[in-house]
Regions:
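A broadly conserved sequence feature marking short terminus-proximal activation segments
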Residues: 2-33, 290-295
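Mobile, glycine- and charge-enriched loop segments
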Residues: 91-149, 187-219, 263-274, 299-302, ...
């Protein structure tokens, strides 16, 4: 299994997701048969459930992962359709019922969850359902806003969230605002306060840094960022290579795809330097069906490096036909089996357009 400490496999680093094999090197090593609204489905046992906030993000990052995920076949970004709160919560509750035997980890992502007025109800539902390993990914800008008598950060920690991932592109406040095109984001002092409060309440903060040429793009930049995180009290950082788009659905002229291709700092040279640096201690490799992760220890911190390629989603689905690797609850309440915006939904069947069983064929 690939999550055992101390056993590094060079071939996995070289091939990344192309080496992914459920039985040989995945975290769970097996699949599980489920019934989704009466239809059989074979599911990877460590599949995650992502809940997509329909709240439009107040940042305009030129490297935005969501804009790559929701780009249609013409290369145009499709803004998410948002169901009413009651319908969305009913759909989420129904999906959690169907996924009970799987007991997936749950991530809330965006859009921008910290600005979503539905977030308190979403988190309350997850808490009532005893959802496993709740993670919220945010740019942090709305964490001190009050909803229903408490701050958004209060709601996140009060729901027992395991992690809060906070996007931060630069150690410098002004540069971070410029890179993320978000003048109203958290400054370093505010970020430090979020880290302090979340940590004290049992929710582990993790800073997320996109690797970009001219910004954090080499070992020196990584070390500077880690020192910045440590000063703020964070003990968990992830460095992400800019995601590769799916060429079948995203035009190379798409502005986000073009930016990512031009600004992508390569992860491989950084990983080679990490391997040679005695201050880093290897922990594990994680193989995903379209992503590859390495986890290292550094000065009491967990340091994560990730590379992902959206073009591998369809490739891996053909390689493992009938297997669902992850679940996504879109902002319209429909449950999907990938991030593809136009994928046929799995359910619930009472939502219009959720009857097609294409993702289940071959299960």
């Amino acid at each position: 299994m690939n999550n055992q400490a101390g056993h590094f496999v060079q071939q996995w680093r070289n091939l990344r997701s192309h080496a992914f094999d459920i039985e040989q090197n995945s975290t769970a090593g097996k699949t599980l048969m489920l019934s989704l609204w009466g239809r059989p489905a074979r599911v990877y046992t460590n599949a995650n459930l992502s809940i997509v906030s329909g709240q439009e993000c107040n940042a305009d990052c030129p490297f935005c992962v969501e804009k790559l995920r929701r780009t249609n076949e013409d290369g145009v970004f499709e803004k998410p359709t948002q169901a009413g709160e009651a319908i969305f919560l009913r759909a989420l509750d129904s999906a959690l019922d169907e996924l009970t035997p799987l007991n997936p980890s749950v991530s809330v992502t965006g859009g921008e969850p910290s600005l979503d007025p539905r977030l308190p109800e979403i988190l309350s539902l997850l808490q009532r359902r005893n959802a496993r390993k709740i993670t919220v990914t945010t740019n942090g800008s709305g964490l001190f806003e009050r909803r229903q008598g408490a701050t958004m950060l209060d709601w996140i920690t009060g729901a027992g969230a395991r992690h809060i991932n906070i996007s931060r592109a630069s150690v410098d406040d002004a540069r971070n605002a410029a890179l993320m095109r978000m003048p109203d984001g958290l400054d370093s002092a505010g970020l430090g306060e979020v880290i302090r409060l979340a940590s004290a309440r049992g929710t582990r903060p993790r800073l997320s840094c996109a690797l970009m040429d001219g910004e954090v793009d080499n070992m020196e930049g990584v070390l500077e960022y880690l020192q910045f995180a440590k000063r703020l009290g964070a003990d968990n950082v992830i460095f992400r290579e800019l995601m590769k788009p799916d060429p079948a659905t995203v035009s190379r002229y798409n502005p986000v795809a073009a930016f990512c291709e031009g600004a992508r700092a390569r992860l491989a040279p950084i990983l080679r330097q990490v391997s040679r640096n005695d201050d880093f201690r290897f922990i594990r490799q994680v193989m995903g069906y379209y992503y590859y992760v390495e986890v290292w220890g550094y000065g009491g911190m967990d340091v994560v490096f990730e590379g992902a390629d959206l073009g591998l989603i369809d490739f891996m689905k053909r390689k493992t036909p009938g297997v669902i690797h992850e679940f996504v609850i879109r902002s319209d309440g429909r449950l999907g089996s990938s991030w593809h915006a136009r994928e046929e939904p799995l359910g619930p069947p009472w939502l219009a357009g959720a009857m097609e069983p294409a993702a289940l064929r071959g299960a």
